[in-house]
Regions:
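C-terminal segment of N-terminal export signals and the immediately downstream linker at the start
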Residues: 13, 34-71
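N-terminal secretory signal peptides
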Residues: 1-15
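Active-site acidic/histidine proton-transfer and metal-coordination neighborhood
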Residues: 23-25, 31-35, 134-271
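Conserved, mostly hydrophobic/aromatic
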Residues: 92, 154, 235, 306, ...
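Acidic (Asp/Glu)-rich catalytic clusters
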Residues: 81-88, 104-121, 155, 223-227, ...
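Structural preference for beta-strand elements that scaffold enzyme active sites
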Residues: 65-69, 91-93, 119-121, 160-163, ...
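Gly/Pro-rich active-site loop or hairpin
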Residues: 97-98, 243-258, 263, 278-343, ...
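Short, acidic/polar
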Residues: 73-84, 144-151, 289-294
Length: 384
């Protein structure tokens, strides 16, 4: 072997070693970028530099950037918390059951996350799903008061966002199916109507009744949120079907969000958890598409956090998919969010199950975060 051949082989071996050193979370994004860089080189020569210097790229952890995060339960294990740190996450959404959402317990949970350098960006207290609240039943004031205390406690802890939804009697899925070899949730509207649907409560509830219940709830909790400086982030109805199990659903269209915004008035503490997957499920029936929603609410600072999920196609049937495996162009989504200056948290949503995955599904989670990180870095290069 000639001296030049040895030099070329040595450079290639060095490149492979450097690629293998990439952390798991950056493998899918940074690794492919590095291989693309090597591919620009002719055999035995150094890679050619970019023809023009690129603009400075926003650091991933800059406060002005999108905050990659994950949604987890308050009882997450120490190993799972360490895993989140290992894949480079510094933010999380934490979900509390009503009996877990005390100030003492939330303080303990926050300290556990802080020990791994992870901040809690948003929190959920599932007391908001109380049928008394969401159906406007007698006794709801006690549950609403519990939610008000929760908001005050988030303010004391410096947790800036409270996520919630408003869809009593919901059915998320009709089957678990295989897609590209992984396990994912399917919703088939025809199957739901024929096989799954049944009246959930003692009677049916109209859209007017659910609007009355939502208005009562928001009027009661929004002042507490404003006083605590905590933002209320409303998730759309998933799936966006107008009525399920005998109860109307009101956040299945752009008009529903606009009406909810009117209920909240000019408050800066009311906004959206914008679930990209849910909006993609609805397709044309949503009134505005994903990108129009981002421009409408995002430009006005009304998107507080984002659930980043793709689906196989719109209703009447869809399968939840990894971000690279659905019909929506997720790079366009990421770029659109950067263009409107979104700087909230972004979490993978309903992570599909890869072989051997359990708990928080670390393999699937790492896959999603790596893909999202790659899209975000590219969007930052283009947007600045």
């Amino acid at each position: 072997m000639s001296h030049d051949d040895q030099k070329s082989r040595g450079a290639a071996d060095s490149g492979r070693r450097n690629f293998l050193k990439l952390p798991l979370a950056a493998g899918a994004a940074g690794g492919l970028a590095y291989l693309a860089y090597l591919s620009r080189a002719e055999p035995g020569k150094e890679p050619k530099p970019d023809p023009a210097p690129r603009r400075p790229v926003l650091d991933e952890y800059d406060e002005k950037n999108i905050k990659l995060a994950h949604r987890v339960s308050a009882g997450i294990s120490d190993d799972e918390l360490l895993f989140l740190k290992q894949i480079g996450l510094r933010w999380a959404r934490v979900e509390f059951q009503p009996d877990e959402a005390t100030l003492d317990n939330m303080t303990r949970v926050q300290r556990r996350f802080a020990a791994q350098d992870i901040k809690i960006f948003s929190a959920v207290n599932y007391v908001h799903r109380s049928p008394k609240i969401q159906l406007g039943q007698k006794g709801r004031d006690a549950d609403i008061e519990q939610y008000q205390v929760f908001l005050r406690d988030l303010g004391k802890l410096g947790i800036p966002v409270a996520d919630y939804d408003f869809h009593p009697a919901n059915t998320y899925t009709t089957a678990t199916v295989e897609r590209r070899g992984y396990q994912a949730r399917e919703f088939d509207l025809d199957d739901f109507r024929k096989r799954v649907e049944k009246r959930r409560f003692e009677r049916e509830y109209s859209a007017e009744e659910i609007w009355d219940a939502y208005t009562y709830f928001v009027k009661a909790v929004l002042p507490a949120a404003e006083k605590a400086d905590v933002k209320l982030a409303l998730h759309p109805d998933d799936p966006p079907v107008a009525k399920m199990n005998g109860v109307a659903k009101i956040f299945v269209h752009h008009d529903g969000y606009k009406k909810a915004e009117e209920v909240a008035g000019t408050s800066k503490h009311w906004g959206l958890t914008f679930c990209v997957g849910t909006w993609a499920e609805g397709g044309d029936r949503m009134g505005k598409d994903v990108f129009e929603m981002i421009r409408d609410f995002g430009k006005r600072g009304k998107i507080f956090d984002v659930h980043f999920r793709n689906v196989s196609g719109p209703l009447p049937r869809f399968v939840e998919a990894f971000p690279d495996d659905g019909y929506l162009d997720m790079y366009r989504v990421m770029k659109a969010l950067r263009e409107v200056g979104f700087r909230g948290a972004m979490e993978p949503d309903h992570v599909p199950q890869l072989a051997g995955d359990k708990g928080i599904r670390p393999a699937g989670t790492a896959y999603c975060i790596a893909y999202m990180r790659g899209l975000l870095r590219r969007a930052n290069e283009e947007v600045g």
